[in-house]
Amino acid sequence: MMRHFYYTIQTLLHERGVNIIKIISMTLGIFVGILLFSCVAFQLSYYNFCPQSEQLYVTYMDGPFTYGPFSAAMRENFPKEVEDATILRDMGTNVFYNGNVRLTESTIYADEHLFSTLGLKLLIGKAEELTRPDVLFISRSLAEKIREGNSLESVIGKTLSVDREEPMSIRGVFEDMGENADIHFDVVVPMSKLWNLARGGWGYDISYMSIIRFRDPAKDIKAVEARIPDMLKKYMADSSNKKKSHRFSFRPLLEYHTADPTVRLMILMMSVLGIAILLIVAFDYVLIAVSSLARRAKSIGVHKCCGATDNSIFRMFLTETALVLFISVLLTMLLIFQFREFVEEIAGIRLSSLFTWQTLWVPLTVLLVVFILAGAIPASIFASIPVTQVFRRYAERKTSWKRPLLFIQFAGMTFILGFLMVVFCQYHMAMNKDLGYNPERVVMGWKKLGSNRQNAKSFFMNLPMVEEHGVGQQAIWRSWSGEVFNVGEGRTIKGRFEWIGDDFVPMMKIQILHGKNVTSPKEALVNEEFVRRAGW
């Protein structure tokens, strides 16, 4: 074994020019391949940090949203099938103040069953306190920011004010969620705060995410779905009206992320691109290695004259490939570390989340595939050289096997270039597509104005850099399941509902095809899709 290793080192040093090309080619290919397949594995691992995550299901109506009281009704009506259930609502990013320190944190509304349902570890506090509307639960990472060098327990009882207006007391600290989740939050606001505002009733406000933990999903889900119509009769008098859709279904939380067609397409593209790059790298190595066949044939014949068998030659060339691969891996690690910030920005994931012990099999699999493809083919070719080649000049007779390799090389490069052109065209289209409104020179901020809306408008319009001002409840591009609308003849449709001021439409340069802008609380604007679905 040591003799094989010695011969391999000598060969690598003797042909260092060619080997440098091999190492550079393989390093770049492994670098891109590992990142692509690690991103794919990350996308497929969403919510696997939840204990017994296969028991967690999301409630769907038209989308993954439902009525506010739904989870509580599930716990009450199906105690044998439902182990626990929680309801939550995304609040986006909110501003909190710890004294004079400004904190911008992702926030959700949730009930006291959030932690027990998802299996999130509650480090400090009691979940039951989430029934109080004046409390907050925060993540460990946020607690680290505000504990000021003291223990985590010291944050309990501290007050965070929402926009310097509404003080709320910290009553619990929970463990940080993994990055592989669509629902990110560092602050939990009690759902009772919304209930006190008369939000989230039956038959309206379909904007809540209900997550159910079933005891035995295989048999419980079908039984529960069959009994839901009877349950709804207790809470909604018109639930049996056939013209009003109240269809409920449950889908695994583990599939919630990949249910998005955009995510599935991204996974497919990264997988195909990764496979193409690895094949190109492996066969590029094979072609470079085999191009030295005529030159190395005599030395292989000498080895065989000295007693080396075909297996010995095969192992020697596998060792050579392994050494080149090892050096390439070291350089790949150096590249990843050197361009850490760039990689994290492009992938949108921290490297500590992308490369974990649970996903270590991904880069190892990539390396194994490259090693087998790049090592086995040239090793078998070199091992088949007869011992008689030591006595005469080696002339390669069969070259037909090179053509498939060259075809794969050119086909792979053509595919990658074509793929990049398609991506460029899509990017150009996305950046220049007519959105139906004009976002240029528009900035936004979130603030509860209430009766001060006119004062706020006067303040902004008096600023010399402000041309127009408008107000709305949410950003114009936000999309979620919304309200139920009665469109006549006993029919209902569901759609997003947005409160806006009369200055919003002209500011965003939204074109009104028919009618006029809203001027009173009893008027509304609808888009063409709403008209189509309503059948008007």
Language-model features: where?
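Small-residue-rich transmembrane alpha-helices
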Residues: L35, K233-K234, T321-I385, C425
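Membrane-proximal extracellular/periplasmic loop immediately following the first transmembrane helix
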Residues: L36-V95, R102, S106-I108, G203-R213, ...
